[in-house]
C-alpha cells in the first residue's frame, strides 16, 4: 500500500520538475540566451538598389547645410533670416567655414552633416532633440549589436556607436527581443516573417521603412510584402511603433500605448522627418523625479510642434538612449529607478 501511494507521488514530482525545467529553458531561450541567426538564403536576401542608380543623385540636397532654430520653451520659433539682407550677410550665413569638422558640446558641422542638439522642457519631461540635416541620405545608418544578427545579442548604444564611429546615435527597435517581424538593415533582409497580431506583451502597430532616397514611410506588414519593400527600395525597416505622425497629422490619441507600458508616461525614443534629408532623433527621459516621461500623444505633439511630417516611435523605456560625440546625452533609466544604460539589439546613427 505504501509503495502504491509513493509511486504516483514520485511520478507527479518528477513530471512537475521536468515541466518547470522545460518552461525555464524556453524562457531563457527566448529572452536571455544569445543566438546568432543566419540571413535567409533566398531571392529576398538582399535588396538590389541598381534599379535606383539613375535616381540616387536626386536624393542629394543641393542647398547649403545649416540648421533651423528649434522652438523655445514657450513654443515660439524665431523667424528665419529674410532674403532682403546684403550680399555680405548672405555669404556669412551660407558660405562654409574653411576647416571641418566644427564640433561643440551640442553641435557638429562638416561638408555633409549638420547636427544641433537641444533639451526642451515639455509636459514635465526633458526632450533631448537632435536636429539633423544631411546632403545625402547615405549618412543615416543603422548597426547591429556586436555586428551580429540574432536573438538576445545585445550591446550598449554607446558601445555600438563607438564601434561604428557614429557621430550621433539612438537605440533602435530592439528587434532581437522578438522572433518574428520584418528586419531590414542596410538593404539586407534578415527576417521576413510577419509579426503576430495577438501578442499580449506588445500591441501590433505599423512598421517604418527608410527608403533609398531617405524618405520615412510607415506601412503595415499585413498588406506590404517583402517583395513590395524590395520594389520600394527599403534600406531600413523597424518594427516597433506606433506611427506618431503621418502626412503631417498626429495619428495617436490619449489611449495609445505600447503593450503593458505605463500609460501616464515613459522614456521614449523617436525618429521624425521634417523634409528632404532633414530629420529629428528624439529621446525623452522618464521614470525619474526630474522627468516623468511623455505619453505617446505628448511625444507626437512635441514632434509636430517641431515641424515633423512623419514620425515613428522606437523602443523606449530603459532602452531610450542618445549618444553624441563620445558621450551620453540623456539619462537612461533602467529598472524604473537606476540611471544606467541598457544593452540593446541595434542602433540608428548618423555617420560615415
Residue ranges and their predicted role:
Residues 122, 135-137, 175, 223, ...:
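Short, glycine-/Ser/Thr-/acidic-enriched flexible segments
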Residues 131, 167-171, 209, 217, ...:
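Structural recognition of the beta-strand scaffold that forms the well-ordered cores
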Residues 2-201, 207:
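Zymogen propeptides
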Residues 180-198, 202, 255-309, 319-352:
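Conserved, well-ordered active-site substructure
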Residues 144-150, 223-226, 284-288:
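Short, solvent-exposed aromatic-acidic interface loops
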Residues 127-131, 207, 243, 270, ...:
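Conserved hydrophobic/aromatic beta-strand scaffold that supports enzyme active sites
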Residues 125, 137, 214-215, 273-280:
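Beta-strand-turn-beta hairpins that frame and shape the catalytic cleft
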Residues 79, 98, 104, 108, ...:
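Active-site-adjacent helix-turn-beta-strand microarchitecture at beta-sheet edges
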Amino acid at each position: 500500500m505504501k509503495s502504491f501511494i509513493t509511486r504516483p507521488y514520485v511520478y507527479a514530482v518528477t513530471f512537475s520538475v521536468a515541466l518547470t525545467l522545460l518552461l525555464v529553458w524556453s524562457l531563457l531561450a527566448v529572452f536571455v540566451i544569445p543566438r546568432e541567426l543566419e540571413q535567409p538564403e533566398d531571392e529576398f536576401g538582399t535588396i538590389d538598389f541598381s534599379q535606383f542608380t539613375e535616381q540616387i543623385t536626386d536624393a542629394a540636397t543641393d542647398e547649403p547645410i545649416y540648421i533651423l532654430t528649434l522652438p523655445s520653451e514657450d513654443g515660439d520659433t524665431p523667424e528665419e533670416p529674410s532674403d532682403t539682407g546684403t550680399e555680405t550677410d548672405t555669404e556669412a550665413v551660407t558660405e562654409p567655414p574653411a576647416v571641418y569638422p566644427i564640433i561643440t558640446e551640442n553641435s557638429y558641422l562638416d561638408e555633409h552633416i549638420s547636427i544641433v542638439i537641444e533639451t526642451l522642457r515639455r509636459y514635465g519631461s526633458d526632450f533631448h532633440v537632435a536636429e539633423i540635416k544631411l546632403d545625402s541620405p547615405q549618412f543615416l545608418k543603422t548597426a547591429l549589436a556586436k555586428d551580429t544578427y540574432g536573438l538576445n545579442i545585445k550591446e550598449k548604444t554607446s558601445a555600438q556607436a563607438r564601434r561604428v564611429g557614429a557621430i550621433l546615435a539612438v537605440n533602435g527597435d530592439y528587434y532581437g527581443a522578438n522572433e518574428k517581424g520584418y528586419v531590414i538593415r542596410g538593404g539586407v533582409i534578415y527576417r521576413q516573417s510577419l509579426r503576430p497580431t495577438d501578442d499580449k506583451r506588445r500591441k501590433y502597430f505599423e512598421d517604418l521603412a527608410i527608403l533609398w532616397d531617405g524618405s520615412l514611410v510607415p506601412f503595415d506588414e499585413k498588406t506590404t510584402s517583402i517583395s513590395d519593400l524590395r520594389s520600394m527600395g527599403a534600406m531600413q525597416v523597424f518594427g516597433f511603433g506606433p506611427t506618431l505622425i503621418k502626412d503631417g497629422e498626429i495619428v495617436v490619441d490619449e489611449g495609445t500605448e505600447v503593450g503593458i507600458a505605463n500609460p501616464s508616461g515613459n522614456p521614449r525614443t523617436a525618429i521624425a522627418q521634417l523634409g528632404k534629408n532633414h530629420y529629428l532623433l528624439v529621446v525623452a527621459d522618464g521614470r525619474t523625479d526630474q522627468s516623468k516621461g511623455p505619453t505617446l500623444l505628448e511625444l507626437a505633439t512635441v514632434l509636430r510642434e517641431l515641424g515633423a511630417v512623419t514620425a515613428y516611435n522606437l523602443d523606449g523605456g530603459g532602452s531610450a538612449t542618445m549618444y553624441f560625440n563620445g558621450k551620453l546625452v540623456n539619462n537612461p533609466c533602467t529598472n524604473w529607478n537606476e540611471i544606467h544604460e541598457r544593452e540593446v539589439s541595434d542602433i540608428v546613427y548618423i555617420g560615415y
